[in-house]
Amino acid sequence: MSATALRIVEGSSMDKSKALAAALSQIERQFGKGSVMKLGKNDRSMDVEAVSSGSLGLDIALGIGGLPKGRVVEIYGPESSGKTTLALHTVAEAQKKGGICAFIDAEHALDPVYARKLGVNIDELLISQPDTGEQALEICDTLVRSGAVDVLVVDSVAALVPKAELEGEMGDALPGLQARLMSQALRKLTASINKSHTMVIFINQIRMKIGVMYGSPETTTGGNALKFYASVRLDIRRIGAIKERDEVVGNTTRVKVVKNKLAPPFKQVEFDIMYGEGVSKMGEILDLGVKAGIVEKSGAWFSYDSQRLGQGRENSKAFLKANPDITAKIETAIRQNSGLIAEQILAGTPERDADGEEPADE
């Protein structure tokens, strides 16, 4: 028996290339040309196109210059931490490049005035406010399959209410219903997301697990499927307030790249989100410039190329805003050196994710 099997293997090894060619020919006849190909010949799969997140520091931390197209992205964090702001900045950046964007507002809470202030062209933004989770994900699937949408935002997973839950009564126990809905939707979506080159951003909320003795009790809604299907997961937190005299005018925000299939993960970056403005580009350029050694800081004074920018961070930000030429020079210098100094300026440590576990290597 073993001798016969050995002879079969020996015989087939002589004509492996012919056997492979016959198999590939059969697959292409059955499933169409391009069903199987050599990876190196598919140029599109080699280079992942990215859309800027609206934050210079986060673009560097992500390793590819922004959020990836043709992939699933999850942004999660506590309430009022900047999740929707970050998603809207990405939409604005995609629109600047001529992209078509859609926003599925399951929370029914999108503020068009704020979106416009962030740079979103609301006249061209497609918006849907679905009644049920099934309707939201069906709309998402149809838009992705069209191949015409560049960025699609779902805000939020927690607000995707299954139809059975809506039709039931308050207090009905329906365990795992939303998780099953998300799992089924993502199984259908992933292939068409990759083919259509659409970036789908899922915004998610945080919940607390009861009875957790060790590790973080935090978890995200919608089950585990999204954690597996997402190529990038961002944990966004508000870590401080920005004040002008006694008035709070913004938040200091920290974003951790909890998962990244396209570059080394676990980087983290901090930036300012100003009320009514969004991510403070001037604040980021100032902070990254100091960390990279491009902007000099002496006491409270900031200077660039022997020219003083201002005393104090807020004054320096105002100077940069009033002098776009200097701002552009500093930004160019940061981007040119980002590859060499990314590890120094954005060094992060392995952080526990929203389930209190260190994410495994992909």
Curated annotation (Swiss-Prot):
PROSITE patterns: RECA_1, RECA_2, RECA_3. GO terms for cellular component: cytoplasm. One of its GO terms (molecular function) is damaged DNA binding. The keyword ATP-binding applies. Keywords: ATP-binding, Cytoplasm, DNA damage, DNA recombination, DNA repair, DNA-binding, Nucleotide-binding, SOS response. It is found in: Cytoplasm. NCBIfam families: tigrfam_recA. This is Protein RecA. The gene is recA. GO terms for biological process: DNA recombination; DNA repair; SOS response. Can catalyze the hydrolysis of ATP in the presence of single-stranded DNA, the ATP-dependent uptake of single-stranded DNA by duplex DNA, and the ATP-dependent hybridization of homologous single-stranded DNAs. It interacts with LexA causing its activation and leading to its autocatalytic cleavage. Belongs to the RecA family. SUPFAM superfamilies: P-loop containing nucleoside triphosphate hydrolases, RecA protein, C-terminal domain. Coiled coil: none annotated. ATP binds at G77, P78, E79, S80, S81, G82, K83, T84. Pfam families: RecA, RecA_C.
